[in-house]
Amino acid sequence: MIKDLAKNKKALHDFSILETFEAGIVLKGSEVKALRAGRANLKDSFVRVIKGELFLLNAHISYLETTHSAFRPNERAARKLLMHRKQIDKIFGQVSQDGLALVVLALYLSDKNIVKARLALAKGKNLHDKRETLKRREADKEARAAIKRYV
């Protein structure tokens, strides 16, 4: 059973998702505890390839009140993502050539209680694309409601 610890709903609104990946993430113990307590925000976070390695940037993981002041990490620190070299090279090629973005969709606990990141290769939406998506979603919602009403 996979439990989502933090979701990036804004990424689903601003981007159209083309392909998803799973990556491990390097965290400190206090950060894992904070994630389990639901103290993370991925709203403006993104992923960059720096010197052939993936880093999660601008993700906010608050520390717990019980964390000692000497061990309180920077809340917006760059966190390294762990993937196979071939996957990183493939992603880097697509991001650099096709003009795609690499965004984080969620942080979750795997079956073995390891924190993982769900990444996505995505293409940015224009304003009219966002409006079209909202209209389509609203129409589907109304259709489902009408079917429920008359069945």
Swiss-Prot record:
Top-level taxon of the source organism: Bacteria
Location(s), subcellular: Cytoplasm
UniProt record similarity statement: Belongs to the SmpB family.
Record InterPro entries: SmpB, SsrA-bd_prot, SsrA-bd_prot_CS
Task of the protein: Required for rescue of stalled ribosomes mediated by trans-translation. Binds to transfer-messenger RNA (tmRNA), required for stable association of tmRNA with ribosomes. tmRNA and SmpB together mimic tRNA shape, replacing the anticodon stem-loop with SmpB. tmRNA is encoded by the ssrA gene; the 2 termini fold to resemble tRNA(Ala) and it encodes a 'tag peptide', a short internal open reading frame. During trans-translation Ala-aminoacylated tmRNA acts like a tRNA, entering the A-site of stalled ribosomes, displacing the stalled mRNA.
Keywords annotated in UniProt: Cytoplasm, RNA-binding
GO annotation, biological process: trans-translation
Gene: smpB
NCBIfam families, per the entry: PRK05422.1, smpB
Keyword Cytoplasm applies: yes
Source organism of this protein record: Campylobacter concisus (strain 13826)
UniProt-recorded name of the protein: SsrA-binding protein
Molecular function terms from GO: RNA binding
Record's keyword annotation contains RNA-binding: yes
GO cellular component, one term: cytosol
Main location per the UniProt record: cytoplasm
